[in-house]
Amino acid sequence: MKLIAYLIDGHQVDIRPAPVERDWMEATSQRFAYRCLPLNIANAYGWEVLCNASFLAMWTGGSGIDAILIEPEPGTIAPAVSHFGHGILTFHIPCLFRTEPGAELMVQGPINRPKDGIAALSGIIETDWSPYSFTMNWTFTRPDTPVRFEKGEPYCHIFPVSCGALE
C-alpha cells in the first residue's frame, strides 16, 4: 500500500518509521516486555509524527478555548493549540496525505506509549480522495494536571488501512 505526504508550503514536519523500542519496555526486568511479539509488531507498524518543540500544557477544567494553558520552551512556538475547547489539545499536521483508492489513513496516538493526564483521540482520514490536511487531537483526562510534550516525542501514529475489507 502506497502512502505519500505532501508538505504544505512554509511548514516543517518530522515523520519517522515507528520504532519497536519503548522506554517502559526497556525498563521491564530483563526487557521482558519485548518477548511479547504482538507488542513488538504493533509498536513498529506505521509511522510517527514528532513534536518539533517542547511545551507544557494544562487544562483548567473549563469548556472554552482559553481553558488550556500552553507554555512553549523559550524561543520556540508550541506545535499544539486549543482549537475546539472542552479540554481538547490540537496538533495541526501540515501535510496532505494520499493513499491508493480504497485505502484510508488510521490516525491515533503513539502505540503503546501511554501519557499521564491526557489521552489521544483516534480517527480515520479518507486520504484516497480528501483534499484536506487534518489535526491530531488529545483530550485531557483531568483538570489542573500539567502535561509535557518533548521535542522529538511522537504525538501521532499513522498507518494506511483498507476499511472496505472490514465490511
Regions from the PLM with identified roles:
Residues 1-133, 139-167:
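Non-catalytic terminal segments and appended small domains
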